[in-house]
């Protein structure tokens, strides 16, 4: 593209692999070296208005975290909601989104434009905005994030190399369990590099980055906050269900740290036991409210209590979903990912690769 800045397209093999975090961490490193950064997300993957609002809030959060002026940010050209998809399928929408993206990039003044790709390599194909189409249209270098599930993460990365060719400049393997780090360093990394794939970062799993704020859980559950509302920014790293006798419960509760405990509103014994361990919030189901002594103790310990209308099973399903779809919205997470990238991302190798074009 004539008169266009260099572009780095950051993608993933699956949603919620950590693209936003990688972008935040890498962008901050580059800014510290004096580079002017711009950021964009060409395609919004939200399926409804509520999800679209959250996605736009995430874009705004990244922009603010990087202190980018509005002129240095490009919001989605299209969202994958049902109405938009139907219009495209019916032929009512004939927009050439790839050309629209190219035009929007040409209006940016930056040393590097970081673009966040869709959830996988094929999403957006209906609109001409699949990952490979994006990379080709704007002549972008590609950085892929692979979330570790097993050593077979190499399968997806090898296939991506076949699809993307020389535009794939490197990969970051994210969320690696500590026990799998040696194998990933000694076997997976050399194997990928022997197949022409530069491994620029190996990031161990971090409980904080996979945690959810009490505030977010309250939002997802449509919960009523009964006390300690000023402490909704506490982070929840795990979920525990309290449905046993109190003697078993105390030992069980001690096994989890920074946890949310889901239990019945009438189980005063379990509520007290949970409050005496590392608990970030109580989530009470059913229609029975907690006793005054529970409210008082929770206030003393600065632990929020949430009351929900759902039954225990539904509540647990919603919380589990929240853990699976973690958003990067808390400053403490930004600090964490920036430290991880600063420590474990090979910036020198990245810059050398980018300089070669």
UniProtKB/Swiss-Prot annotation:
Signal sequence annotation:
none
Q: Which InterPro entries match?
A: DRTGG, DTB_synth_BioD, P-loop_NTPase, Ser_kin/Pase_Hpr-like_N_sf
Q: Which terms does the UniProt entry file under GO BP?
A: biotin biosynthetic process
An example Gene Ontology CC term for this record: cytosol
Task: Write down the species.
Answer: Synechocystis sp. (strain ATCC 27184 / PCC 6803 / Kazusa)
Q: Name one GO molecular function term.
A: magnesium ion binding
Q: What family, per the record? A: To A.fulgidus AF1212.
Annotated TM spans: none
Output the PANTHER family linked to this UniProt entry: DETHIOBIOTIN SYNTHETASE (PTHR43210:SF5)
Protein's name in the database: Uncharacterized protein slr0039
């Amino acid at each position: 593209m004539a008169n266009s800045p260099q572009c780095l397209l950051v993608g993933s093999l699956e949603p919620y692999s950590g693209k936003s975090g990688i972008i935040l961490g890498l962008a901050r490193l580059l800014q510290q070296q004096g580079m002017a950064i711009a950021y964009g997300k060409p395609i919004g993957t939200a399926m409804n208005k509520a999800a679209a609002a959250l996605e736009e809030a995430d874009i705004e959060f990244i922009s603010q975290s990087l202190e980018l002026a509005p002129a240095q940010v490009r919001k989605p050209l299209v969202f994958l909601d049902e109405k938009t998809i139907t219009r495209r399928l019916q032929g009512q929408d004939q927009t050439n989104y790839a050309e629209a993206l190219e035009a929007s990039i040409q209006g940016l003044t930056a040393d590097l434009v970081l673009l966040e790709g869709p959830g996988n390599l094929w999403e957006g194909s209906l609109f001409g905005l699949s990952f490979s189409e994006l990379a080709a249209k704007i002549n972008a270098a590609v950085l892929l994030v692979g979330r570790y599930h097993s050593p077979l993460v190499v399968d997806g990365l090898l296939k991506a190399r076949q699809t993307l060719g020389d535009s794939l400049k490197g990969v970051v393997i994210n969320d690696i369990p500590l026990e799998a780090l040696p194998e990933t360093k000694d076997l997976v990394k050399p194997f990928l590099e022997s197949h022409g794939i530069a491994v620029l970062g190996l990031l161990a799993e971090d409980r904080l980055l996979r945690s959810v704020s009490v505030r977010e859980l309250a939002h997802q559950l449509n919960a009523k906050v009964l006390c300690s509302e000023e402490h909704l920014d506490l982070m929840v790293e795990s979920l525990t269900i309290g449905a046993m006798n109190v003697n078993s419960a105390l030992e069980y509760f001690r096994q989890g740290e920074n946890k949310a405990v889901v239990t019945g509103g009438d189980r005063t014994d379990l509520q007290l036991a949970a409050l005496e361990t590392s608990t970030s919030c109580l989530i009470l189901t059913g229609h029975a409210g907690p006793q005054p002594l529970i409210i008082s103790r929770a206030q003393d310990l600065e632990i929020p209590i949430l009351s929900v209308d759902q039954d225990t099973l539904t509540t647990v399903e919603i919380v589990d979903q929240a853990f699976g779809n973690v958003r990067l919205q808390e400053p403490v997470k930004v600090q964490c990912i920036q430290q991880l990238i600063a420590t474990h991302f090979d910036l020198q190798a990245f810059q050398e690769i980018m300089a070669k074009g």
